Amino acid sequence: SRTTYNGQFTGKHTLGDADKLDWSTGYSYANRNMPDRRRYTTVLNEETNQLEVENLNEINREFSRLDEHILSANINYQHDFSFGIFTPSLKAGAYTEYRAREYNTRFFIYSWKNGLPSAYKVMNVPNELLQEKNYGENGLYLLEQVDWRNNYEGNNLLSAGYVGTNLPLGKLNVYAGVRFEHNRMELVSHTQKNEESPTSVFYTYNDFFPSVNVAYRLNDKQQFRLSYGRTVNRPEFREVSSSVYYDFDLASNVRSEERRVGK
C-alpha cells in the first residue's frame, strides 16, 4: 500500500511599484508498506520435463515499510529598476528542504527438516506445497534471515540561495545568475549483520551553479536562444546504504555500491 500527502501555503506581495515578494512553505509525507511480498523460483528438470523446487531458499517472503517526511520553504524577491527605456531587474531568493526517511525490512525463507522430500519438489508452490497441512515440526517452517544492514534511517538538509539579473536590451534579452547549494546528508545504517550496530555516515556538498540565458527576438513569432546551466545529480539514501533490494527488471537482488556525485 502507498500513502502520499502534499500540502503547501503560498503568498505574493507587491511592495510599492518596483518590488515584489513571494514565498511558500510545504510539508510532504510518503509511505510505502509492503506487508507480505511472496516470491519463488522453480527450475525445469529436463529429464522429467517438470518444474521443480531446487532450493527452498528460493521460496521467500519479505515485509518492508518506508516512511519519509519532507519540510520545505522558499522566498523570492524582485526589484525592478528604471533608467529611461532601460528597465533591468534584480532577483534574489533562498530555499531550504529537510527530509527524514526510515526504512525497515524483514526477510523469511522456507525450510524443511532434513531437506525437502523429492515428492514435494514437483508440487505447485502456491497451490500445493505451501498449504497448511505441510507445515509442522517435521515439515515446512519459516526461518527469518536476520540482516540489520538492510535497515537504515536518513536525513538530508538542503539550503540554497541565488541572485540573478535580467537585462532587456531591445531585441536582445540577457538573464544571468548564480545559485549556491549546501547539502548535508546523514545516513544511519548498521555495520553488523546479526545485531543492531547503528553507524552514522555524513555526506556534505557545496556547489555553485552559474546560468546564462540569451534570447534574441527575430520577429513577433520567432526568437533565437542560447543558454548555459550547470546541474548536479546527488545519490539518494538507498544508493548510499548497504540495503539489498530486489530489482524486477534485472530479476536479481541488488546491493548499492559507492556512489559519486554526477555533474
Please place each PLM-identified region on the residue numbering.
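Structural signature of Gram-negative outer-membrane beta-barrels, strongest in the C-terminal barrel
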Residues: 2-8, 26, 65-74, 80-263
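Outer-membrane beta-barrel domain signature, strongest for Gram-negative TonB-dependent receptors
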Residues: 1-89
